[in-house]
């Protein structure tokens, strides 16, 4: 299944939670979810009972759409998490958080992961001084992530940094906003990653 490219606000209304897909509109309380907090469609406001499988699938889809990964990428990450020693669900979240596009977003250089992915693919991001244009590139602890010199005054990046001042930066990165670089200091603990996803249902889904 390819990466979703449709109307992102419909996804948030379908799931009933913010997936951080519309950064500035969400912060301003102007997103479609804020205005219409129910699923789109004629019967969107109705709440039906969801099956166990439906719940498992729902959590997987939320994670996929939030991090902007395809089904193939998601399965590959889950398989890697399952092979490692430890809690598979927690390891999966950590692997998703280590994606370069996500780290750029977490550092506050983009209002959404989608824009962060564009910054990476268009060559605006350096990792340890080298240009990397692969959004799925895995960032390891201690890596320096920097916006290239000619893009440091990009108005969208500047606006993202201004908005980040309202929400704060996550604990596992250190950022020099004025210099447009940051350090990915460590992998996050699960309780630090505030996302509307219950990964245990994803583990149950793929363990069948």
Swiss-Prot record:
For the keyword Disulfide bond, the answer is: no
What are the UniProt keywords, alphabetically?
A: Ribonucleoprotein, Ribosomal protein, RNA-binding, rRNA-binding
Concerning PROSITE patterns, the annotation shows: RIBOSOMAL_S4, S4
Q: List cellular component terms (GO).
A: small ribosomal subunit
InterPro entries cross-referenced by the UniProt entry = Ribosomal_uS4 (IPR022801), Ribosomal_uS4_bac-type (IPR005709), Ribosomal_uS4_CS (IPR018079), Ribosomal_uS4_N (IPR001912), S4_RNA-bd (IPR002942), S4_RNA-bd_sf (IPR036986)
Any Pfam family the entry gives: Ribosomal_S4
Report domain S4 RNA-binding positions: 98-163
Q: How would you summarize the oligomeric state and partners of this protein?
A: Part of the 30S ribosomal subunit. Contacts protein S5. The interaction surface between S4 and S5 is involved in control of translational fidelity.
The family assignment reads:
Belongs to the universal ribosomal protein uS4 family.
Per its UniProt record, what HAMAP family does this chain match? Ribosomal_uS4_B
Q: What protein name applies here?
A: Small ribosomal subunit protein uS4
Look up and give the organism this protein is from.
Answer: Campylobacter jejuni subsp. jejuni serotype O:23/36 (strain 81-176)
- Lineage of origin: Bacteria, Pseudomonadati, Campylobacterota, Epsilonproteobacteria, Campylobacterales
């Amino acid at each position: 299944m390819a990466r979703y490219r449709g109307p992102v606000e419909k996804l948030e209304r379908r799931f009933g939670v913010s997936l951080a897909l519309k950064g500035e509109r969400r912060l301003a309380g102007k997103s479609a979810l804020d205005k219409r907090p129910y699923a789109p469609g004629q019967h969107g406001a109705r709440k039906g009972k969801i099956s166990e499988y439906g719940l498992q699938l729902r959590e997987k889809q939320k994670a996929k759409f939030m991090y902007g990964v395809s089904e193939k990428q998601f399965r590959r990450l889950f398989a890697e998490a399952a092979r490692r020693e430890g809690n598979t669900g927690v390891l999966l979240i950590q692997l998703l958080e280590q994606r370069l596009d996500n780290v750029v977003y977490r550092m506050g250089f983009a209002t959404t992961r989608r824009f962060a992915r564009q910054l990476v693919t268009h060559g605006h991001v350096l990792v340890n001084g080298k240009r990397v244009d692969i959004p799925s590139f895995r960032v390891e602890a201690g890596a320096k992530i920097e916006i290239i010199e000619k893009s440091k005054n990009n108005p969208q990046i500047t606006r993202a940094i201004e908005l980040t001042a309202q929400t704060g930066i996550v604990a596992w990165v250190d950022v020099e906003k004025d210099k447009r670089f940051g350090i990915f200091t460590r992998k996050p603990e699960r309780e630090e990653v505030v996302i509307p996803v219950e990964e245990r249902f994803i583990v149950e889904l793929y363990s069948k």
